[in-house]
Amino acid sequence: GLGDVYKRQVMLMDSAGNVIGKSSLSLLNGKSLEDEVYTTVRDMGTLAVPVSLIPVLEKGNVSLSDTVDVGNGIYNHNGKEIRDHNADMGGYGEITLQQAILFDSKVGVIKSLSPYTTIKTTYSPTEILNFYHSIAVSDHSICSAKTMKEIQQTFEMVVSEGTGKPLFSDNVKIAGKTGSVIKEDGKHEVSFCGYFKVNNAVYTCLVIISNPKNGYPSGGIMAGDVVKEIVNYLDR
């Protein structure tokens, strides 16, 4: 199926919301899947969490400072085992909802949000890129100024102290979120979506890497390297 052909996908959007660059190292029967890859709805994993988080913050059901006990990082939700990436090392224990986002704790997010909403993770890459672009340019049609600021601060903290730390750069401030998906066949997919400012222009970038070959599959390191290359290219 389509799931096996993705290797690496990159999309770059400018301040106006135009996609100015995309590349996909995906070939199926020798044909490039360019546009289909970007518009096909699929499991975007934890990259999609902020989309579900915003309405819950807006309603005041939760706040980012709420605490949640994720225990050892293994949680049974509706008969399905949810595992945090550090479950083998004992989990995060008690953390805030904001930290659950910073550290990409699926258990923390599900325990915090599932009483109020169903966390939807199936979107096309283009939809996810558009969402992060809305945050990048402070599009208040998606939420109040207060929530917008909270999400932007959280995305900045992902890079300064969370799973996006490998993206930290002294020259260009990058903000966003790392993502991960474990497919049904056990294969991994890691990603980063975020934004940065170069020469007074705001760019939004999505990187997805499938079946990462080297080392522990981390969106911060693997997808982050690609984002840094793009930043350096634009910041020449």
Language model features: what each stretch is:
Residues G1-Y6:
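Short, small-residue-biased leader/transition segments that mark boundaries at the very start
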Residues I20, S114-D139, F155, V159-R236:
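Active-site beta-strand/loop architecture of penicillin-binding DD-peptidases
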Residues R42-L47, G91, I95, Q99, ...:
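Soluble non-cytosolic domains of exported or imported proteins
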Residues G17, T40-V68, A100, P115, ...:
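Active-site SXXK
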Residues S32-T39, E81-I82, G90-I95, L102-V109, ...:
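Flexible glycine/proline-enriched surface loops and loop-helix/loop-strand junctions
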Residues K7-S32, G194, C205:
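A short, well-structured edge-of-sheet supersecondary motif
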